[in-house]
C-alpha cells in the first residue's frame, strides 16, 4: 500500500480521520527494559511501556499461516488494518515503503502455482501408482529393458503446453548426454539458428550431472525412480518457450519446470522424473518478444534445474515415500530458492572473493567489481533482488502466502527466512524440512523446536539488526544476525552498481517524518494495513521514561486470533 495512505498525526491536533490510540494502562501493558540491541516480542493488543528513555524500533506483525483468501485469486487475500501509537514526547521515524498495485501474480507465477496444485491433485494417484510398481517383482531382464528404453537415441516425450489448460503435445528428442545421474535430451524441433550446438547442450548435461544434482540429493534427499533407470531426464524444448506466447510480457517467461503428473501414471504422464527447460533461439514471453539469447539460457537453465530438482525431491520425500501431502507452497518455493543459493555457493567457492569487491582477478569473473562470479549470476542475484523488493513494499506481500499465491517477492522473503533459520539451526535442518510428513509452519516448528511466531519475530529483528551500523563485535546476539551473509554490505554494493533496481543501500532504511508530522508531547498515532504474514517498521526516540505504546485493531480491543498479531520491540543505540 502507498505510504501516503498512512495517517500520522499528533492527537493534540487530531481530526476525525486521525486514529486515537489510548496509552496502555499499567495493568495491561508489558514493561520493556532493554539494553542496546535488546529484543522483546509481545502479543498484539497487549500494549507495552518502555521503562527507559531512548531510541526504539517497533515491528508490528501478523505471524499468521492461516488461509485468509475469500476466493481463488491473489486479490482475494485481504489486508487487515491496525493502529499503533502512544503517549510521549517523541521524535519518530517511519520506514519507507513503495506503493505496489495489489501484488497480483504474473502469468509465469500463476503457472508455477498451478504446477504445485497439480502435484497436490495428482498425489493420491501417484501414491497408488507407486504402490503398484512396488508390488511388481522386477527381474534383471525387466530392469535392463527399462534402462535400455530410457536411453534410446531418439524418443518421444509428452510436454504440458498450456499455462492454464490440461493440454499436452508430443515431441521427439535426441539424446545428447548420458551420465551417472542425468539423461539430457534435446527436442529435434529446437532452433539451430541462435541455438546451442549439441556439444553445448551436452555441457549442460555434465554440469547438471556432476555439479548440481549431487548438491540437491546430498542436502534434501533422493529423487524417486519410478522408471527404474537410475537417472533423471532433462528435456530442452521450445514448447516451454511457447507457454507464454499469449501473455505478451517480454522478459516474463517460463524458464523450466517439473511436472508432478509425470509420476502419477495418468494418460499424459511420461512415467519418469523429468525437468523441462526452455531453449535459446525461440521467442518467449509474448508473440512480439525477441528470441531467448544464448547467454540468457546459459544463466537461467542451471539455476532453474537445481530449483525444480528440489520440487522433485520434495514430492518424492513427502508424497511417494511417506504417503503424505505435498509441502505448503510458500515453504516448498523457499526451499527451492535455497537450492539455488547452494548451487551459487559452489561457484563462489571456486572463485572466492574473501571480502566484497574489488575481488581477486580470475577467469571466473568478467570484472573484479562483481560480488558474485560469472557462474553464480543465475543463482544468487535474483534471490537478493526478490527479498529486497519484498521489504521495500512489504505491506502488500506475505511470507507465508495465504492460499499459496506466491509472488516472486514472497519467494524472496521465504528464501531469506530459511537462510536465517539454517544459520541459526544448522545446514542439516534443510534435509529435515524435506524428509518428513509435516508441512508448512508445523514443519518449521518441528524442525526448529520453537513456535513459528517466535521464529518469525526474531527473523524480522535479524533483518533490521544484521551488521547494524556502529555495532561492535558481540554486541548483537547471534540470534539476530545472518551468520552466512552480510546483508547490509551486499545490498550497499548492489545499490552502487545497480541503483535502478536497488535505489537505497538497504530496504529497511528509514527516513525522518516531515516537519509537520513530528510527534508532539501529546501523542502519536499511525493507521495502516497489512497482509497476514507481513509486518511494518517504525522507529522513534523518547526523551522520557515509561513511554506507552499500543498495537491494536481500529475497532474492538483485540485482533483475530488467527492473525497471530504481535509486536517486536528493539532497543537501538542513541
What are these regions (language model features)?
Residues 324-414, 441-467, 471:
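Acidic/His/Gly-enriched intrinsically disordered linker/tail segments
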Residues 1-7:
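Sec-dependent signal peptide recognition
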Residues 11-13:
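C-terminal motif of bacterial Sec signal peptides marking the signal peptidase cleavage site
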Residues 18-45, 49, 67, 439-574:
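Beta/coil-rich, acidic/histidine-enriched accessory regions frequently appended to metallopeptidases
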Residues 180-328, 335, 339, 343-349, ...:
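Juxtacatalytic substrate-recognition/specificity segment
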Residues 342-350, 421-431, 439:
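Secondary-structure boundary elements
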Residues 15-199, 203-207, 211, 215-219, ...:
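Zymogen propeptides/activation segments of proteases
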Residues 308-318, 336, 410-430:
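Alpha-helical scaffold elements that line and support the substrate/ligand-binding pocket
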Amino acid at each position: 500500500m502507498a505510504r501516503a495512505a498512512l495517517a500520522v498525526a499528533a492527537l493534540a491536533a487530531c481530526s476525525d480521520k486521525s486514529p486515537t490510540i489510548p496509552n496502555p494502562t499499567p495493568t495491561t501493558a508489558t514493561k520493556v527494559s532493554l539494553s542496546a540491541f535488546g529484543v522483546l516480542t509481545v502479543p498484539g493488543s497487549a500494549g507495552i511501556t518502555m521503562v527507559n528513555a531512548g531510541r526504539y524500533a517497533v515491528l508490528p506483525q501478523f505471524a499468521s499461516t492461516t488461509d485468509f483468501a475469500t476466493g481463488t485469486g491473489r486479490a482475494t487475500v485481504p489486508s487487515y488494518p491496525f493502529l499503533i501509537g502512544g503517549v510521549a514526547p517523541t521524535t519518530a521515524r517511519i520506514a519507507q515503503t513503495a506503493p505496489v498495485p495489489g501484488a497480483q501474480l504474473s502469468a509465469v507465477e500463476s503457472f508455477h502455482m498451478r504446477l504445485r496444485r497439480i502435484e497436490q491433485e495428482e498425489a493420491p494417484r501417484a501414491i497408488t501408482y507407486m504402490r503398484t510398481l512396488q508390488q511388481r517383482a522386477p527381474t534383471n531382464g525387466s530392469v535392463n529393458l527399462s534402462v535400455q528404453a530410457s536411453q534410446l537415441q531418439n524418443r518421444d516425450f509428452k510436454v504440458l503446453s498450456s499455462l492454464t489448460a490440461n493440454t499436452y503435445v508430443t515431441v521427439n528428442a535426441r539424446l545428447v548426454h548420458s551420465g551417472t545421474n542425468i539423461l539430457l535430451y534435446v527436442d529435434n524441433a529446437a532452433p539451430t539458428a541462435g541455438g546451442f550446438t549439441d556439444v553445448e547442450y551436452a555441457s549442460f548435461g555434465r554440469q547438471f550431472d556432476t555439479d548440481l544434482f549431487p548438491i540437491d540429493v546430498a542436502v534434501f534427499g533422493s529423487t524417486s525412480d519410478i522408471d527404474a533407470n537410475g537417472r533423471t531426464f532433462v528435456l530442452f524444448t521450445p514448447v516451454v518457450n511457447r507457454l507464454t506466447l499469449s501473455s505478451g510480457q517480454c522478459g516474463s517467461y517460463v524458464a523450466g519446470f517439473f511436472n508432478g503428473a509425470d509420476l502419477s501414471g495418468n494418460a499424459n504422464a511420461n512415467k519418469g522424473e523429468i525437468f523441462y527447460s526452455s531453449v535459446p533461439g525461440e521467442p518467449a514471453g509474448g508473440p512480439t518478444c525477441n528470441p531467448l539469447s544464448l547467454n540468457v539460457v546459459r544463466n537461467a537453465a542451471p539455476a532453474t534445474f537445481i530449483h525444480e530438482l528440489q520440487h522433485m525431491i520434495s514430492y518424492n520425500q513427502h508424497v511417494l515415500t511417506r504417503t503424505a501431502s505435498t509441502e505448503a507452497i510458500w515453504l516448498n518455493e523457499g526451499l527451492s530458492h535455497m537450492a539455488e543459493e547452494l548451487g551459487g555457493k559452489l561457484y563462489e567457492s571456486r572463485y572466492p572473493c574473501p571480502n566484497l569487491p574489488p575481488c581477486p582477478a580470475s577467469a571466473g569473473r568478467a570484472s573484479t567489481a562483481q560480488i558474485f562470479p560469472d557462474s553464480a549470476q543465475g543463482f544468487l542475484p535474483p534471490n537478493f533482488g526478490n527479498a529486497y523488493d519484498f521489504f521495500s513494499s512489504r505491506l502488500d506481500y506475505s511470507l507465508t502466502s495465504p492460499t499459496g499465491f506466491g509472488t516472486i517477492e514472497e519467494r524472496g522473503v521465504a528464501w531469506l527466512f530459511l537462510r536465517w533459520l539454517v544459520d541459526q539451526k544448522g545446514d542439516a535442518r534443510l534435509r529435515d524440512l524435506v524428509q518428513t510428513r509435516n508441512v508448512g509452519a508445523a514443519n518449521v516448528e518441528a524442525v526448529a523446536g520453537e513456535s513459528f511466531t517466535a521464529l518469525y519475530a526474531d527473523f524480522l529483528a535479524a533483518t533490521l539488526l544484521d551488521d547494524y551500523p556502529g555495532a561492535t563485535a558481540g554486541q548483537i546476539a547471534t540470534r539476530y544476525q545472518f551468520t552466512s551473509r552480510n546483508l547490509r554490505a551486499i545490498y550497499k554494493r548492489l545499490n552502487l552498481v545497480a541503483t535502478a533496481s536497488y535505489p537505497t543501500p538497504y530496504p529497511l532504511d528509514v527516513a525522518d517524518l516531515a516537519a509537520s508530522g513530528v510527534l508532539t508531547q501529546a501523542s502519536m498515532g499511525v493507521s495502516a494495513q497489512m497482509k497476514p504474514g507481513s509486518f511494518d517498521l517504525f522507529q522513534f526516540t523518547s526523551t522520557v521514561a515509561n513511554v506507552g505504546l499500543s498495537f491494536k485493531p481500529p475497532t474492538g480491543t483485540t485482533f483475530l486470533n488467527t492473525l497471530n498479531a504481535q509486536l517486536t520491540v528493539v532497543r537501538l543505540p542513541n
